[in-house]
């Protein structure tokens, strides 16, 4: 990266301030989001943001105020040096009698390797070509009537990108061709993006809604009077509620922040996988507890078994390469294998109590439906169906990850209903005297 090019771009506004304005404060933030790339030779990504405070002459009724915005994430292409690009435009400064803030939106486009050009938003809509990048600059000007000080802020708005325009660390599913968020190295910008339409919108909202629903369901359940639901049952169900809320909440956070930066993605990706393991553990505990309600030894043994398997899955998910796209089938296999460990206590129960009791007393039909939904979702996720067969047609809706999320939320509610029936049946029976 050439520092002179960066300095030249960031100083563009000061060089163009020829309207008699006195610059009082000019603050620029430059963040290198992947400094390790200097050693590895990978693409360098830089984020620029700028805020300028100027004093304008009191007789500048008809003068224009120059502005520029240097807020853009600039990936360094292989074989080329990274370049910082400035954007220049004009807005009317107005009179001193007008103390109202001014707000202008400008839009720029450029071809690959070309110069940015301003698009006229007032005239005939200019259709964007496939080989062009687009950027919106949000300009806000706040003038003080008493002092004549003008505070200007510039914000570059992100646009959804095609898959091939993404940096390598954001290229997860090549069958989703368009509608991706660009890198947004700002937590506030990432969370603002949940209100926009892009490839992660469905993934974010499916688990956000599920997380909120389970949170309030848990609050209702755990605050019931003890003569309705005893404290011991509240403790047992708490494992399931905690697993569901953490799994869905961490998944929501990961998909919201998945475009922030490499390091943030690595952290929240591991938390996302940890949440899946916690949901599996939390789902097993009440089922085993009520399934072997009158038998302490198998109850303790199987709860310990699933806890150890869950911890093992968490340890495996901490491996950095575990989150890579090529390990997608292995990820699905790890969690499916952990869920299938429930076959062992099921066979035990059939041997001791029979198949009829398994369905009549343990609501096993609901657990089978839950297992089917989890396996269906995992299968769609691992094979990237349906977008594999319709590339570019499922970019926003009905992609495999959204369907997987939907299956998870529905399966969790099915499981809650099933273990509730199990608990009701067990609490209304007497354990046999042994």
UniProtKB/Swiss-Prot annotation:
Q: Which residues lie on this side of the membrane: Cytoplasmic?
A: 1-201, 256-273, 321-331, 384-403
Q: Which UniProt keywords apply?
A: Fatty acid metabolism, Lipid metabolism, Membrane, Receptor, Transmembrane, Transmembrane helix
Please provide an example of a Pfam family that matches this protein in its UniProt record.
Answer: HlyIII
Q: Enumerate the Extracellular topological stretches.
A: 223-234, 295-299, 353-362, 425-434
Molecular function in Gene Ontology: signaling receptor activity
Which Gene Ontology terms of cellular component type are present?
A: plasma membrane
Q: How does it sit in the membrane?
A: Multi-pass membrane protein
Q: Which InterPro entries match?
A: AdipoR/HlyIII-related, PAC
> Residues annotated as region Disordered?
74-103, 118-137
Q: Transmembrane segments in this chain: where?
A: 202-222, 235-255, 274-294, 300-320, 332-352, 363-383, 404-424
Chief location category: membrane
Instruction: Output the superkingdom of the source species.
Output: Eukaryota
Subcellular location per the Swiss-Prot or TrEMBL entry = Membrane
Some GO term, biological process aspect, for this entry: which one? positive regulation of fatty acid oxidation
State what this protein does.
Probable receptor, which may be involved in metabolic pathways that regulate lipid metabolism such as fatty acid oxidation.
Family as reported in the entry's similarity comment: Belongs to the ADIPOR family.
* Stated name of the protein: Progestin and adipoQ receptor-like protein 1
Biological source species: Caenorhabditis elegans
Q: What is the lineage of its organism?
A: Eukaryota, Metazoa, Ecdysozoa, Nematoda, Chromadorea
């Amino acid at each position: 990266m050439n520092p002179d090019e960066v300095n030249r771009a960031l100083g563009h506004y000061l060089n163009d301030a020829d309207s008699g304005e006195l610059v009082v404060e000019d603050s620029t933030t430059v963040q290198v989001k992947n400094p390790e790339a200097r050693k590895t030779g990978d693409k360098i990504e830089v984020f620029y943001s700028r805020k300028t405070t100027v004093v304008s002459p009191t007789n500048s009724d008809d003068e224009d105020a120059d502005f520029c915005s240097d807020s853009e994430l600039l990936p360094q292409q292989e074989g080329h040096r990274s370049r910082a690009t400035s954007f220049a435009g004009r807005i009317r400064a107005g009179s001193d009698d007008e103390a109202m803030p001014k707000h202008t939106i400008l839009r720029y486009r450029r071809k690959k390797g070309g110069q940015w050009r301003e698009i006229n938003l007032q005239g005939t809509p200019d259709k964007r070509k496939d080989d062009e990048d687009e950027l919106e600059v949000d300009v806000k000007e706040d003038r003080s009537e008493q002092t004549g000080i003008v505070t200007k802020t510039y914000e570059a708005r992100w646009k959804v990108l095609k898959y091939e325009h993404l940096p390598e660390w954001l290229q997860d599913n090549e069958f989703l061709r368009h509608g991706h968020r660009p890198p947004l190295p700002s937590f506030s910008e990432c969370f603002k993006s949940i209100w926009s339409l892009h490839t992660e919108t469905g993934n974010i909202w499916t688990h956000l809604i599920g997380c909120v629903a389970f949170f309030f369901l848990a609050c209702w359940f755990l605050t019931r009077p003890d003569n309705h639901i005893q404290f011991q049952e509240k403790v047992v169900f708490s494992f399931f509620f905690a697993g569901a809320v953490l799994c869905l909440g961490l998944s929501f956070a990961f998909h919201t922040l998945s475009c922030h930066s490499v390091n943030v993605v690595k952290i929240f990706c591991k938390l996302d996988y940890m949440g899946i393991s916690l949901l599996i553990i939390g789902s097993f505990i009440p089922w085993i507890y009520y399934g072997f309600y009158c038998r302490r030894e198998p109850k303790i043994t199987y709860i310990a078994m699933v806890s150890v398997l869950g911890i093992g899955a968490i340890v495996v998910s901490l491996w950095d390469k575990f989150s890579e796209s090529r390990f997608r089938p292995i990820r699905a296999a790890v969690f499916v294998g952990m869920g299938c460990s429930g076959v062992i206590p099921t066979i035990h129960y059939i041997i001791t109590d029979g198949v009829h009791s398994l369905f009549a007393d343990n609501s096993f039909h609901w657990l089978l439906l839950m297992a089917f939904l989890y396996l269906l979702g995992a299968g769609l996720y691992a094979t990237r169906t349906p977008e594999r067969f319709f590339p570019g047609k499922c970019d926003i809706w009905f992609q495999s990850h959204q369907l997987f999320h939907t299956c998870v939320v529905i399966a969790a509610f099915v499981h809650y209903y099933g273990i509730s029936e199990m608990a009701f049946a067990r609490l209304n029976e007497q354990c046999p005297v042994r």
